[in-house]
């Protein structure tokens, strides 16, 4: 008997097929995407309203009462603002949500996404340092952008430099 491993030609490996009659579940409807987007945007807009009141010099208790949130939420926003310019930066996800909510046109969203200075995920020791390109992948997976839109953005980003892994 020969103990040499057999060379596998991947073309010979059969690809499993779904059971006969099976169809994938339908994606979310535009109405469902809109509802989810509105809920997510409400949180973002509230965070930015809290930031504006902090910049205007309001104290935490007054902001909490005005916004209907716990004082601890205001403190978290204030602490993030001390270490970063904003606690709630604009992201590719937000642009997708704004389009789904009807707050932004298809053209405006795509113009912004085409010119976005993307960063890409990398492995850092035993963790993943996510980049904002992951937001675009998420938007596609959840149905917020079409295959065609994703393909156009991917073609733009294919030539962009990727961050090296740190192992």
Question: Model-found features: residue ranges?
Answer:
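Acidic, Ser/Pro/Thr-rich low-complexity regulatory regions
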Residues: 2-167
């Amino acid at each position: 008997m020969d103990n040499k491993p057999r060379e596998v030609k991947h073309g010979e490996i059969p690809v499993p097929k779904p059971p006969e009659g099976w169809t994938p579940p339908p994606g979310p409807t535009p109405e469902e995407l809109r509802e989810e987007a509105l809920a997510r945007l409400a949180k973002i807009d509230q965070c930015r309203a809290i930031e504006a009141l902090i910049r205007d010099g309001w104290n935490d208790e007054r902001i909490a009462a005005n916004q209907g949130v716990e004082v601890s939420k205001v403190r978290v926003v204030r602490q993030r603002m001390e270490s970063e310019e904003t606690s709630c930066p604009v992201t590719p996800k937000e642009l997708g949500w704004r389009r789904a909510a009807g707050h932004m046109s298809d053209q405006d969203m795509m113009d912004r996404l085409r010119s976005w200075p993307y960063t890409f995920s990398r492995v850092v020791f035993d963790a993943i340092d996510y980049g904002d390109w992951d937001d675009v992948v998420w938007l596609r997976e959840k149905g917020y952008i079409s295959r065609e839109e994703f393909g156009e953005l991917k073609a733009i980003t294919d030539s962009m430099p990727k961050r090296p892994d740190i192992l």
